[in-house]
Amino acid sequence: MEIFAIIFAEFSYLSYFYIVKVNTLPQYPTPTNGSNRTNMNRTETERIVFVDYIRVVACFLVMLVHASENFYGADASGLAGNTSMLLNESNRFWVAFYDGTVARTCVPLFMVVSAFLLVPMKEGMTMHGFYRRRFLRILPPFIAFQLLYTFLPVLWGGWSWQEAVESLKVIAFNFSPMAGHLWFMFPLISLYLIIPVVSPWLEKSTAREERTFIALFACSTLLPWLHEFVLDEVWGECFWNGFHMLWYCSGYLGYLVLAHYIRKHLHWSRQKRMKVGTLCFLAGASFTGWAFWWRGEPGVVLETPHLEWSWEFCTPNVLLATFGAFLLFSCIESKTCPAWVSRISRLSFGMYLMHMFFLSAIASWMVGGNAAEPLLPVALAIPCIALLSYLCCLVTTQLLSYLPGSKWIIGA
């Protein structure tokens, strides 16, 4: 308990420093025309190049995460479910490295990018106009793939027609049992729902006010650690109240405000963004990988939430790594990007939606039923599974994009 008291005290001091002292950090002067010297402001006619690079890389990182899951699953599917087991030290290290250190920022990066581009809303945009525009883009492909993941596995014996029909009852309320990765769509939808509500505040908020909210959000990311090591219920949680003290400052809303703060108020030089970004990413990512390695024990079945105690996307380490990664990407100040980067960026949503169709088959072939001795050494097997899946998805979405009405299937 003493160590957590020390951690909390240090975290409180850092929050104070972040709120009060950060104004003294050197910033770019605001030019007389009101635009930032960095290229992070939105314009109607110019794409933000580094955002395209984030989409391209983050999409691959998602597949790297799911490729890694094939090497610590304890159930018949081979994927990490409610329980996990590492078969040897090699799996322990490389899963921690790829899934934890390298790829854990993938989901928060997508959230930050969404908020970075959409907040605050364009002048004159109404709530219903915003909802119509965003949901017409994401809901038809989402629903289409919910149905595809439900019925296509019947064709290759993944499950029976009866099981597929039963799963229809599930997808009315949640993601398909065959498509666990579609959980991401629900927090993305919730983020879109809240944007018109917080957008007016963000238009008027000062840098210090946004830092205050971000500091509260940072404190809320301690919750998974408190649940794991201190108490199951903290900050007012109990069986009749599931909303803790910082509930309304927590979750992906924090990444939304962070994205707006970076775009509007953080006018650091490229050199400073490079230095701070590198330090933050290395510190956060290293801890994320180490925490999995430390908790994992080869040959022992563990409850997955306990094994992944530091991997939740709203934890201090992942927040720190995401902030660092975003700063590093923002150092890409080119006005244009290669056509292939722009193209993959546009196709990335469809690639994400379909990737488990390919990844499951490729992983099954690569692992061969024995995660301890895959076709290639684990150090190579995990990135190879991810890369092959990525290429298959890229080719498929590119071909589908030529079809009339493809935007209703792949969003592009």
Identify the residue ranges that each predicted region occupies:
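Membrane-cytosol interface segments of multi-pass membrane proteins
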Residues: I3-L222, G369-A412
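Helical transmembrane-bundle signal
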Residues: V62-V65, M111-L117, Q146, G254, ...
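Membrane-helix interface motif
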Residues: N70-G78, V154-W161, F229-D232, F292-V300, ...
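Interfacial loop-to-helix transition and helix-capping segments at the boundaries
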Residues: V95-P108, A172-P187, E228-Y255, T288-F323
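Alpha-helical transmembrane segments of multi-pass integral membrane proteins
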Residues: G296-P404
